[in-house]
């Protein structure tokens, strides 16, 4: 049988990991262990990503907590393997997190991870697409959050269509992005405003802690725009990521 997997952060990232996770670093290590074992086996994390899990994924996601208010309810759209939703829940025990994911194999992993990490009091998993859970139907309950997060899911215009209806008025959407953030914010600002959002703002998170800093696009929901019920919500749950 293979020996235990060492999922601790590499020495050069130990200070950043301790800064971002504090006394819950052991819990973050336990989650990392699930990702580099079951996550890889189930195809949720690529084998090449495992060695760079801490710098490219865990610390990158944890840095975004600085944009999330104390005690917020967070809805994470397209959670996949739990990035960023589970990371946020690990780093911030004050948050209430809902992981939204349409694919069965991913939701199965998330449910098991929440159980193994003993996060059931603050985290729950909902199988469905963002368009469905925003309006409910087909066995999917309507959801809203103070903050709605997404990472590596889609271009900003589509993300806004999916995420803004889930944000409570006055709340915010926080999309973790890369080098394209400023360009996307400018390109899709008009679409965002038609959907009830304010001007997209680009923020750098974790400056001085992680390198490179985590880039996020933040959009405040300024007004409510009617959300049409998706055809899939009238039939059955499923389909591709949404």
From Swiss-Prot:
<feature type="binding site">
    <location>
        <position position="151"/>
    </location>
    <ligand>
        <name>S-adenosyl-L-methionine</name>
    </ligand>
</feature>
<keyword id="KW-0489">Methyltransferase</keyword>
<dbReference type="InterPro" id="IPR003682">
    <property type="entry name" value="rRNA_ssu_MeTfrase_G"/>
</dbReference>
<keyword id="KW-0808">Transferase</keyword>
<protein>
    <recommendedName>
        <fullName>Ribosomal RNA small subunit methyltransferase G</fullName>
        <ecNumber>2.1.1.-</ecNumber>
    </recommendedName>
</protein>
<comment type="similarity">
    <text>Belongs to the methyltransferase superfamily. RNA methyltransferase RsmG family.</text>
</comment>
<feature type="binding site">
    <location>
        <position position="78"/>
    </location>
    <ligand>
        <name>S-adenosyl-L-methionine</name>
    </ligand>
</feature>
<feature type="binding site">
    <location>
        <begin position="130"/>
        <end position="131"/>
    </location>
    <ligand>
        <name>S-adenosyl-L-methionine</name>
    </ligand>
</feature>
<dbReference type="Pfam" id="PF02527">
    <property type="entry name" value="GidB"/>
</dbReference>
<comment type="function">
    <text>Specifically methylates the N7 position of guanine in position 518 of 16S rRNA.</text>
</comment>
<dbReference type="InterPro" id="IPR029063">
    <property type="entry name" value="SAM-dependent_MTases_sf"/>
</dbReference>
<keyword id="KW-0963">Cytoplasm</keyword>
<keyword id="KW-0698">rRNA processing</keyword>
<dbReference type="GO" id="GO:0070043">
    <property type="term" value="F:rRNA (guanine-N7-)-methyltransferase activity"/>
</dbReference>
<feature type="binding site">
    <location>
        <position position="83"/>
    </location>
    <ligand>
        <name>S-adenosyl-L-methionine</name>
    </ligand>
</feature>
<dbReference type="GO" id="GO:0005829">
    <property type="term" value="C:cytosol"/>
</dbReference>
<keyword id="KW-0949">S-adenosyl-L-methionine</keyword>
